[in-house]
């Protein structure tokens, strides 16, 4: 009994600490390897899109499929789970696209928790709500609506004692931190010299 408790406790703690770091591997795949139901849901939104690419993504917490493309001068990323269920729609934005008060809240968090930082990328995220039709999520995302349920994903690097560390932070629509993970580059052990 004591052993089972220790085993479960150890597994829980390991999972908790691993979830704080992001080890991501993104592999480009053919359209044929992309979930068919996911593609059919997204197909009408891909009209007039350029640079359409399909990916399989494995990170420290999950596996997913992603399609990336450019449409109306915006870089989109639409993510699905392995069953083809829509998870979220993201597109790159600039600081000026975030309401000023909300950006000030985000910036205050960054300044108070990191001595020196540099924002590398900002994405507006439209997550699929549990009671919402995925088609509605896509409609809202492609109309670029600023809604209370959107999030901002900010990728930045910050100075630490050992140099610079990359982070991925997720903030809600008013600038409150939801998650913060250290982000590590892909492992290149497979490259032989």
PLM ranges: what are they?
Residues 23-24, 40, 66-68, 95-100, ...:
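Phosphate-end processing signature that detects enzymes handling 5′-triphosphorylated RNA
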Residues 50-58, 116-132:
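Short glycine-rich, low-complexity/disordered patches
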Residues 46-79, 136-170:
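Exposed beta-strand-loop-beta-strand "reactive/processing" segments of non-cytosolic proteins
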Residues 1-25, 42:
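Bacterial Sec-dependent N-terminal signal peptides
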Residues 82-126:
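Long, charged/polar, surface-exposed segments that mediate recognition or autoinhibition
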Residues 76-88, 163-185:
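A short, surface-exposed beta-strand/turn
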Residues 46, 93, 99, 111, ...:
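Eukaryotic scaffold repeat domains enriched in small/polar residues
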Residues 21-65:
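Start-of-domain marker
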């Amino acid at each position: 009994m004591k052993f089972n408790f220790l085993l479960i406790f150890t597994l829980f703690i390991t999972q908790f600490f691993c979830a704080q770091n992001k080890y991501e591997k993104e592999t480009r795949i053919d359209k044929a390897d992309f979930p068919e139901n996911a593609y059919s849901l997204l197909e009408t939104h891909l009209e007039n899109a350029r640079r359409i690419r399909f990916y399989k993504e494995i990170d420290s917490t999950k596996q997913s499929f992603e399609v990336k493309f450019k449409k109306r001068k915006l870089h989109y990323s639409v993510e699905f789970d392995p069953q083809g269920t829509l998870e979220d729609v993201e597109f790159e934005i600039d600081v000026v696209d975030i309401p000023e008060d909300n950006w000030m809240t985000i910036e205050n968090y960054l300044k108070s928790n990191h001595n020196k930082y540099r924002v590398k990328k900002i994405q507006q995220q439209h997550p699929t709500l549990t009671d919402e039709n995925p088609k509605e999520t896509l409609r809202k995302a492609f109309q670029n609506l600023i809604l209370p349920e959107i999030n901002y994903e900010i990728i930045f690097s910050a100075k630490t004692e050992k140099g610079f560390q990359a982070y991925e932070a997720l903030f809600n629509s008013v600038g409150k931190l939801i998650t913060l993970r250290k982000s590590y580059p892909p492992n290149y052990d497979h490259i032989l010299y």
